[in-house]
Structure formats: C-alpha cells, structure tokens
C-alpha cells in the first residue's frame, strides 16, 4: 500500500493542523496508510488545543518527495502556500474552503471545496458520509478549528453549517463551546511572550494580477500590544519583502473583542490597500473597521483592486 502524507499550508494555524489530523484519522479508519504532518511551527493557540486534548503535534517536514509520491492537501490549494517540493509529488486529494488559485494537476483527484468557515466542517460531513465515527478527541480538534476560523462564530465567514457542526462536535467532545472557545482564543491572543517572528507567523502569500502579496494576521485583545512593537515588526516585514521579492506586505492586527482591525502595510503597492478600503496609511498604519477575516474581507477585495 502506498503511503500518503496529508498537510495544510505553511505557517500552520489551528484549522490546518486539526484538519490534517482529522483527515488522517478518517482515512486510517478506511484502511489507508497515511500520516498527518505540518509545514511549520505551531502557534500558541494550536499548542493550547493539542495540549488540552492531549494530542501529539504532527511531525514537522521541510520536503515530502523524499518520503512519498502521493500527498493530500487540507485547508489550502495554492502552490506557493504548500510544501516547497509540491511539484515533485502527486496530489491525490484536496479538502479546502478557500478560493482556488495557482492549482492544477496532470491526473484526476478527489477535490472538495465548500464555501464554509472551516475545513473541519467539511470533514465532519465526510466522516458521516463514510459512516466513520468521530472520536471524542478528534471531535475536540475539529471543534477547535471551527472556533478558531470563525472567531467563535463572529467572523463573516461563519455559516449555519459551521454552527451546526460545532454543536454536534461539542456534544461528542463534551465541552462547553463558549467557555472553552474564549479560553482557546485568549490563549492564542496572548502576545506577551511572542517574538516578532511569531507575531507574523500566520502569513500567507498570494499572487494578485502578477503581484506578489503576503498577508499576515494576528488576533489580540488589545492592538497596542502589537503596535507598541511596530518598529521591530516593520523591520521584519521589510526584510521579508526583500527576501521574497514582494510587492506588498499587509499585516492585519485583529481585536477579537471589538471585531475591528488595524493594518500595517509596506511595499510598492500600499496604495492598492488604501484604494480597497478607502483609508490613508499614516506611518504605514491605518484602521480597518469591521475587518476580521483575511479569507473573506481582505483577499477578495485586494484581488479585485489589483485587477482594476
């Protein structure tokens, strides 16, 4: 039997890690030889989740073609967000809830993408469609992913399907959604011990009308906890622009209590962000009122503005 590795995007978040583990459990129950791995370090929120449910973190890998010939992707499809040697392996399956871009295969594959708030919402359907029982531990991980991606149902990406799935998973995991959810989000929003690199850990690269754009996001309970370190943050953002040849680096600092954000933008195309949101960046900083979702409120808007 051919072994498969399953993983989410680089700079993994809670959905990416929990989806990879959950997908692997589903496929193992069906007799597959599969292992969940990760493409980067865990953030503090995900570390809290794995510790809470006593789950070992997936193994960290830099490349995959040296181990397997087939892989499955969760929570992403764009090649620049995936493992560096993605072109050297065959993608046999994708389960995702993002836009489809920069993705093609030479062979048919299983591809499932739905416009929901979280990948594990889709995975719960797949467990049920295949009549595979969701364990208490996996239910906890899947619930955590939904809470994370929807900001405890406050994000505009959240759908009724996500809410229903979360209720079902909470029953299996035997946790209270509100109390556990706030504890989890606050664990991720504590930036007091984070390095500057960790502040920018949740970053994704996009191609927008032939422009290289990186968008990082962090959830906090007080944006000043990050803005007080703005000089360090901007220095690292600038270095990333040079190292990666980026046209724009946008850092979205989201207050999970007010559901607003502040943006820091650096690069030759910062004017695109100003046009997209009708704001003016002062010393690289501008308010992004009501913006909490990179997937729904940042990527599509910037993509459209770059295309003008």
UniProtKB/Swiss-Prot annotation:
EC number: 3.6.1.1
Cofactor binding description: Binds 2 manganese ions per subunit.
Transmembrane segments: none
Name of one Pfam family that matches: DHH
GO cellular component: cytoplasm
Gene3D superfamilies: DHHA2 domain, inorganic pyrophosphatase (n-terminal core)
Cell compartments where the protein resides: Cytoplasm
Xref: SMART domains: DHHA2
Catalytic activity field: diphosphate + H2O = 2 phosphate + H(+)
Entry cofactors: Mn(2+)
Binding site for Mn(2+) 2: 15, 75, 97, 149
Binding site for Mn(2+) 1: 9, 13, 75
Keywords recorded for this protein, A-Z: Cytoplasm, Hydrolase, Manganese, Metal-binding
GO terms, molecular function: inorganic diphosphate phosphatase activity; manganese ion binding
PANTHER family according to UniProt: BNIP - RELATED, MANGANESE-DEPENDENT INORGANIC PYROPHOSPHATASE-RELATED
Family from the record: Belongs to the PPase class C family.
Entry protein name: Probable manganese-dependent inorganic pyrophosphatase
Taxonomic placement: Bacteria, Bacillati, Bacillota, Bacilli, Bacillales
């Amino acid at each position: 039997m051919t072994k498969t590795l399953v993983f989410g995007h680089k700079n993994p978040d809670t959905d990416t890690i929990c989806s990879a583990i959950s997908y692997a459990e589903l496929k193992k129950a069906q007799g597959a030889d599969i292992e969940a791995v990760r493409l980067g370090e865990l953030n503090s929120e995900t570390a809290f989740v794995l510790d809470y449910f006593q789950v070992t973190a997936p193994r960290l890998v830099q490349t995959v073609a040296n181990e397997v010939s087939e892989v499955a992707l969760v929570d992403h499809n764009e090649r620049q967000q995936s493992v560096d040697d993605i072109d050297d392996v065959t993608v046999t399956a994708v389960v995702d809830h993002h836009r489809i871009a920069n993705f093609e295969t030479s062979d048919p594959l299983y591809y499932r993408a739905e416009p929901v708030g979280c990948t594990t919402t889709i995975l719960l359907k797949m467990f049920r469609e295949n009549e595979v029982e969701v364990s208490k531990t996996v239910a906890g991980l899947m619930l955590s992913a939904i809470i994370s991606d929807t900001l405890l149902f406050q994000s505009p990406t959240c759908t009724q399907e996500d809410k229903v799935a979360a209720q079902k998973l909470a029953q299996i995991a035997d946790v209270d959604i509100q109390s556990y959810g706030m504890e989890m989000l606050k664990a991720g929003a504590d930036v007091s011990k984070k390095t500057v690199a960790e502040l920018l850990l949740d970053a994704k690269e996009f191609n927008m009308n032939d422009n290289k754009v990186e968008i990082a996001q962090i959830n906090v309970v007080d944006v000043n906890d990050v803005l007080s370190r703005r000089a360090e943050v901007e220095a690292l953002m600038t270095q990333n622009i040079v190292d990666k040849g980026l046209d724009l680096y946008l850092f979205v600092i989201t207050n999970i209590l007010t559901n607003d954000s502040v943006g820091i933008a650096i690069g030759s195309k910062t004017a695109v962000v100003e046009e997209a949101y009708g704001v003016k960046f002062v010393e690289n900083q501008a308010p992004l009122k009501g913006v909490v979702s990179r997937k729904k409120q940042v990527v599509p808007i910037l993509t459209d503005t770059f295309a003008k």
